[in-house]
Amino acid sequence: MVYIIAAYHDLGRLIDNETHNIESAKMLRNDKFLLKNFSSDEVKIMAEAVEDHRASLGREPRSIYGKIVSSADRNPTVESMLERAYDYNKLLHPNLSEDEIIEDARIHIREKYAPDGYAAKTMYFKDAGFEAMLKEVERITRTPEIFSRIQKNFNKKRFGK
């Protein structure tokens, strides 16, 4: 069941990024193969886990399945975090300057992964790698100057500029 939940958890992004967890759960609930091969209770548990996987949900997942997928859905590396936050801000705000995009990315990463961030608080299993990544995020996002330098160096490696 965890594999199915993992496969479905972000499919709803094809429909709507903001409500992707709800859209993904709808897709899972309507999958004829799953309805044929799993009990209605199992389909319900899987759909709820898909709905509950978001770190920004504001509440604990309803099942162990939701906790597993939610915890596994965290960005595993600082590099992936830099890439996603920068690219998303650039896409969302194409008229902002490079420095404004970088600062928005820094703020987002801090809101999500700083010690009091919503994703930092919703890791349901002990994970030394995740904890080390959180410490690194705290270090690099503490000041705009440090973060900007790191992001610009990362972008040079990515884009060759």
Task: List where the protein language model places each region.
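Divalent metal-dependent phosphate-bond-processing catalytic cores, especially two-metal-ion Mg2+/Mn2+ enzymes
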Residues: 8, 57-161
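Short acidic-hydrophobic sequence patches enriched in Asp/Glu that either
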Residues: 20-24, 42, 64-70
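A broadly conserved amphipathic alpha-helix scaffold signal in soluble, globular proteins
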Residues: 26-29, 48-51, 67-70, 76
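An active-site-proximal "capping" alpha-helix that borders the catalytic cofactor pocket
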Residues: 19-35
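Hydrophobic core segments within long, regular secondary-structure runs in both alpha-
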Residues: 25, 47, 102-106
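His-Asp-centered metal-binding catalytic motifs of divalent-metal-dependent phosphohydrolases/nucleases
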Residues: 1-16, 20-24, 45-55
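Inter-helical turn/loop segments and adjacent helix faces that build the functional surface
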Residues: 33-40, 89
